[in-house]
């Protein structure tokens, strides 16, 4: 299992780690990672690993079995070796934009209080699909309300609740097709 450092500190831009596995496809698995894997419609982080006198570009990150976070290199030309200590660097501009779009979509789900059936995020835009029986009549009012929330400058925080607390408050989950991971005993809000 890879320790997902991004869950505790989304603003961590660099960190060291040790290579614990190199996949047959030359993917890299570290003991701990600041790279967020593709999940829930949000793209995985990209960046690079620095080791010795080398540098390995990471083009995306994905989830693997048993909690592994898989880093996908651009090429197989220059990779760290098993056991190497590497310095991780995420593409901070892209990560930060993903975070901003993600937060904006949470606000949109408040402005449109309907179940979410799908969505996607990029570093420049996002989309939510709603289970909407009919078209919304006043899009300008919705846009104005959303812009008010964004301009409000509210502090964004995260917290953790237990799986049992989430089960007791089903209204916290807006998505119909993607449920939060509940097998770990706690869920990040």
PLM segments and residue spans:
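Active-/binding-site microenvironments in catalytic and ligand-binding cores
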Residues: 1-189
């Amino acid at each position: 299992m890879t320790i997902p450092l991004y869950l505790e500190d989304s603003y961590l831009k660099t960190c060291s780690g040790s290579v614990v596995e190199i996949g047959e496809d030359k993917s890299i698995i570290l003991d701990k990672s600041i790279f967020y894997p593709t999940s829930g419609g949000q793209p995985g982080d990209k960046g690079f690993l620095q080791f010795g006198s080398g540098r390995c570009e990471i083009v995306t990150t994905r989830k693997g079995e048993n909690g592994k976070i898989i880093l996908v290199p651009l090429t197989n030309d220059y990779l760290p070796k098993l056991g190497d200590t590497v310095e991780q660097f995420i593409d901070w501009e892209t990560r930060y934009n993903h975070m901003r779009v993600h937060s904006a979509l949470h606000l949109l789900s408040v402005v449109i209080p309907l179940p979410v059936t799908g969505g996607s995020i990029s570093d420049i835009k996002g989309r939510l699909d709603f289970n909407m029986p009919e078209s919304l009549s006043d899009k300008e009012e919705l846009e104005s309300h959303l812009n008010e929330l964004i301009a409000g400058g509210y502090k964004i925080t995260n917290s953790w609740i237990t799986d049992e607390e989430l089960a007791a408050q089903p209204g916290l989950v807006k998505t119909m097709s993607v449920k939060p991971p509940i097998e770990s005993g706690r869920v990040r809000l």
